[in-house]
């Protein structure tokens, strides 16, 4: 049994459970986005996590999950999805028009945070969280979220 723990959550799984788990993948975001804790990521609990919490993976290598249900006991951070967009020039311009500042994370994406921040003219910080990632259909997506208090 492999145990993952941080200040707020504990998650335990077996290597067999991880090997045999069959997660669902999606290119459509639900109401919530989940980012596993560092402990879960380091332990490699990617598929078993999706199966145990009935969340869908956005891509096999992105390690971001989505669901229409809020899972307060998910071992990591939860966000409410506000809006999404692709990476077309016009689409990005409209998406960024009303936001000057956000916390930006990239997962399985072909640009760095610094490069993307420069391209989007986005300052660090604030209460908005943006994720740039690759979806199950191999398309690139920008996701604007708000952090959810799971207490």
Residue map of PLM features:
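SAM-dependent transferase fold signal centered on methyltransferase-like domains
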Residues: 1-151
């Amino acid at each position: 049994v492999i145990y993952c723990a941080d200040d707020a959550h504990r998650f335990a799984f077996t290597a067999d459970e991880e090997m045999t788990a069959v997660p669902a993948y999606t290119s459509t975001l639900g109401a919530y986005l989940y980012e596993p804790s560092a402990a879960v990521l380091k332990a490699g609990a990617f598929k078993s996590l999706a199966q145990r919490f009935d969340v869908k993976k956005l891509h096999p290598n992105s390690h971001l999950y989505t669901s229409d249900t809020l899972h307060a006991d998910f071992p990591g951070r939860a966000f409410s999805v506000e809006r999404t967009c692709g990476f077309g020039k016009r689409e990005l311009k409209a998406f960024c028009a009303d936001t000057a500042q956000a916390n930006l994370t990239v997962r399985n994406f072909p640009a760095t945070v610094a490069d993307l921040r420069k391209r989007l003219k986005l300052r660090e910080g604030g209460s908005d969280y943006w994720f740039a990632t690759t979806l199950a259909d191999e398309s690139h997506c920008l996701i604007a979220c708000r952090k959810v208090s799971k207490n």
